[in-house]
From Swiss-Prot:
Biological source species: Mus musculus (Mouse)
GO MF terms held by the record: riboflavin binding
Protein family membership: Belongs to the folate receptor family.
Compartment(s): Secreted, Extracellular space, Extracellular matrix, Interphotoreceptor matrix; Cell membrane
Disulfide bonds: 99-169, 106-146, 139-183, 152-165
Family annotation (PANTHER family): FOLATE RECEPTOR, RETBINDIN
Predominant cellular place of this UniProt entry's protein: secreted
Post-translational modification: Not N-glycosylated.
Tissue spec: Expressed in the peripheral retina where it localizes to the inter-photoreceptor matrix (at protein level). May be produced by rod photoreceptors (at protein level).
Any Pfam family matching the protein: Folate_rec
GO cellular component, one term: extracellular region
Name of the protein this chain belongs to: Retbindin
Taxonomic lineage: Eukaryota, Metazoa, Chordata, Craniata, Vertebrata
Matching InterPro entries: Folate_rcpt, Folate_rcpt-like
Annotated signal sequence range: 1-31
Length: 247
């Protein structure tokens, strides 16, 4: 039994690192170079903002009843296509060529998801907590938020064997059939997707604008990424992660 538990967590250590790198880089859809220091794995950014996991019933957390695209100020410009994958980047040590600038809301979501997964599963890598699945709502919001953003083909999701790139850039909507397909394809060999109404899963939540002024300013800094053109009076959605545990 102990050996089985050790093998499970060893497998999670091996699988989670490249998957988080893939999430944060949006495959070959990142718009600027990234540092490669975090966890000592190529592709993981050294300067990533920490996502928040909030306990169920948190007064500032509420699961979305529907799945709107997460909006961020200045997010009206669609991604601009540029040359996609080349043969030279079909190597783990190579930098990924841009597929076009990601939309601000998708870039923001992926940064938060990367931080939340890192914080949530770091203790689980050492066997301190059981591995919990993803809520289907998280998958749906992920898919809806990034549906129009460019991404490389599914071959980039392979954790072993030969990897290749599609000859042209594709969007999330063209690559994945739906939200469940997205989560299964990207994280399925590490995290399963919980059944609807599951009592234990990782979910997303959005609180009303202005309810949490300090986190709001923090999120503004993340989205602005040094642009210096913040609009402090503009309403902004609050995005966070929530660990759901229902009775």
């Amino acid at each position: 039994m102990a050996h089985e538990g050790h093998s499970q967590h060893s497998g999670l250590v091996w699988a989670l690192r490249p998957i988080l790198a893939w999430i944060f880089l949006v495959a070959c859809g990142w718009s600027h170079p990234l540092q490669t220091r975090s966890w000592g794995h190529p592709g993981l950014a050294a300067k990533v903002r920490t996502g928040q996991l909030q306990p169920a019933g948190h007064p500032q957390s509420s699961v979305l009843p529907s799945y709107p695209r997460i909006q961020v100020p200045g997010s009206q410009t669609p991604p601009v296509p540029v040359p996609c994958c080349t043969a030279e980047i079909d190597r783990p040590e190579s930098l990924l060529e841009s597929c076009g600038a990601p939309s601000p809301e998708c870039e923001f979501f992926l940064g938060q998801l990367q931080g939340a997964l890192r914080d949530r599963f770091h203790p689980q890598l050492f066997g301190a907590r059981p591995v919990q699945p993803l809520c289907p709502e998280l998958c749906q919001i992920w898919f809806t938020t990034c549906q129009a953003d460019f991404i490389c083909g599914p071959t980039w999701l392979q954790s072993s064997g030969e990897r290749g790139c599609e000859p042209s850039c594709r969007t999330y909507g063209q690559t994945f059939a739906n939200a469940t397909d997205l989560c299964h394809s990207v994280l399925g060999h590490v995290l399963r997707v919980a059944a609807p109404g599951s009592s234990h899963c990782l979910n997303v939540s959005i609180s009303s604008p202005g309810a949490r002024r300090r986190p709001r300013a923090w999120i503004s800094n993340v989205v602005g990424s040094g642009s210096g053109s913040g609009s402090g009076d503009s309403p902004e959605p609050m995005f966070g992660f929530q660990y759901v545990s229902l009775p």
